Amino acid sequence: MSVLASMLAWTLARREHSCALIDADFVAGCLDLLLGVEREPGLRFSQVDAPLGRIEGEAMNHELMTWEGVRVLPYDPWSARQPDWWEVQAAIRALAETNDVVIVDAGQGGLIETVPDLRGGVQVIAAELSVMGLARAKSHRSRLDSWGCEAPHIVGVEPRGAPRGRGHVGIGEAQDYLTATVLGPVKPSVNLCGDVLEGLGIRSVTKGSRKAVSLLADLVEQAIRPVSGASCKDR
């Protein structure tokens, strides 16, 4: 999900949308490592202070590191401090004041239930195209529905390391199982995996991801277009 969120942010920035990327995966985190900007100066989530649940948007935006034109608020999981839900909401609202789009990597998605602005945002599920992956996606979609979220956009991701001809479910089968449109597939990239493992970060929207990410970016633009010029944000 973190790679997909990052590529979506990159694509929207290339389309001249101001974009912020928030790492709200408080179990794994390390979005700055994934992007190869861990040594860059900038605010981390463990340093966010939201007195009375409010943060000044311009000031916060200015303190963030920048990656490919995208403002990034990473989480450092080695810090003992995990942000409270109101701090997450305050960060989202602050960055929504100064960016066209705010993308939140919510990890496994449990945080969505407790943060009102996450429940009210556009939801995206990265579903592994395997029997197990689709079952998990279906379960998560049910959770989103129980929390009052809108129907999510679903992106199918081919499983890594599966034996040739085994363990992989096609887009058509995935759509039948989920009774929903599934974008993709996003194909694994050996070069991207190598770059991330070597600390070089994401250096492009990979060929195997380009079509799905572009279609997802189109959907985000459709979501913000009705109030173009106002302050509607994608979260």
Predicted regions and their residues:
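Conserved beta-strand segments of the P-loop GTPase G domain that flank and frequently precede/overlap
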Residues: 22, 74-76, 103-105, 124-129, ...
